[in-house]
């Protein structure tokens, strides 16, 4: 009897320790390193895609990558879902932070920028990031 209780307690400890190792993902979402991911085969501009992701789950956003391994995981998911090789990720307005300077070393004082914002998409055929108008349409991957 004592041995049964000891073994049962041991199994309970193992179960509880393993249950916290993966994210609690919704049905249809895939888990990696404590986060949940889902590719959506819907064409949206960047802002609409980000808004859609925030509505899926608390803490949801367009995917962000913290490592090449995470990017590889997401690309495999995307290839199973998309007809196209590009998808939005959560990086945007990267050019607004640049310190522009003229080639003659003069500071930029006069500005006539178009109101175009640039957002970043992931090209899964070569695992590279590219920027394009945030108004363009692309598939996307959400993460929470």
Swiss-Prot record:
InterPro entries: C-type_lectin-like, C-type_lectin-like/link_sf, C-type_lectin/snaclec_domain, C-type_lectin_CS, CTDL_fold. Keywords: Blood coagulation cascade inhibiting toxin, Calcium, Disulfide bond, Hemostasis impairing toxin, Metal-binding, Secreted, Signal, Toxin. One of its GO terms (cellular component) is extracellular region. Residues 1-23 form the signal peptide. Expressed by the venom gland. Residues 32-143 form the C-type lectin domain. It comes from the Eukaryota. It holds the Pfam family Lectin_C. It is found in: Secreted. GO terms for molecular function: metal ion binding; toxin activity. Disulfide bonds join 25-36, 53-142, 119-134. Anticoagulant protein which binds to the gamma-carboxyglutamic acid-domain regions of factors IX (F9) and factor X (F10) in the presence of calcium with a 1 to 1 stoichiometry. Belongs to the snaclec family. Heterodimer of subunits A and B1; disulfide-linked. Calcium is required for ligand binding. This is Snaclec coagulation factor IX/factor X-binding protein subunit B1. It comes from Trimeresurus stejnegeri (Chinese green tree viper).
